[in-house]
Amino acid sequence: MKYFSIAGLQLDLELNNNKDLVIEKINQTVVRYPWLNMIVLSELAVGGASRSEEFLLDNNIEGFQNLAKEKDIWLIPGSFYHRQDKQITNVAPVISNKGEIVKLCTKNYPFEPYEKGISNSNESCIFEIEGVGMFGVHICYDLWFPETSRALAMQGAQIIIHPSLTDTCDRNEEKIMARATAIQQQCYYFDVNAGGKQGCGQSIIVGPEGEVLTELGSSEEVALLEINLDKVDQIRRRGIKGLGQPLKSFRDNPVYNNDKIDKDYLISLGDLEMPKKLK
């Protein structure tokens, strides 16, 4: 396998209407780092939480396809709301260096009850770059559900890309989960969070043994990673530090299934709604 270079753009974003800024920053990044193969942006980077027509996927995707082709880079320009069949989903497009849409990755778990009215997905998003390896994508709150990353790893993903939009006080918990995910799935974990008025930054890149490779602050920065995914396969074969081989164990004994879910207990937890004041 050959080496592959990725940049994560943690940008100082306005609440919405960031398209021109995003394009400018992509252009600047390619000039400064001409050896890059892929650029990734944060969740909803262009339009933020707005669901206005101008920020929807269909009204933005062609421009980013043209940009990816022009700059000869793979591009995940964050995510966009996508209106289809009377539903709205949160979708991260994967665009090849030829300008082709390789995948539309839909967020499995919208951030309910805050991301109200957004439909979920039960499909995993995985794609292959020939000669490089297998990539998985899940979006923001999907990180909180280890089943999503396990599903990606069990389909062969050697790196998980994670566009995120977090501006809340639980960012430290998310960074802990990013490390745990990399360890449990024995893969690279590439998290890009929003900055500026959208998010609190602190993007993190983790290696397949849980080692923190890059951790950004809260200001505008670029996270860089150069990978050879043969390392992931070696660790999965031999174990982390020559010890645990969790993917093999799960392969041989996949204990998690719907028959073992206590539905009565889960129902007793109540509706998925905004918390009320404690009495």
Enumerate the language-model features and the residues they cover.
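Active-site-proximal beta-strand elements of phosphoester/diester hydrolases
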Residues: 3-15, 40, 104-106, 133-142, ...
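Conserved hydrophobic/aromatic beta-strand scaffold that supports enzyme active sites
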Residues: 8, 91-94, 104, 124-126, ...
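Active-site catalytic loop in hydrolytic enzyme cores
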Residues: 83-158, 168-176, 180, 240
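C-terminal beta-strand edge segments of enzyme domains
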Residues: 126, 194-279
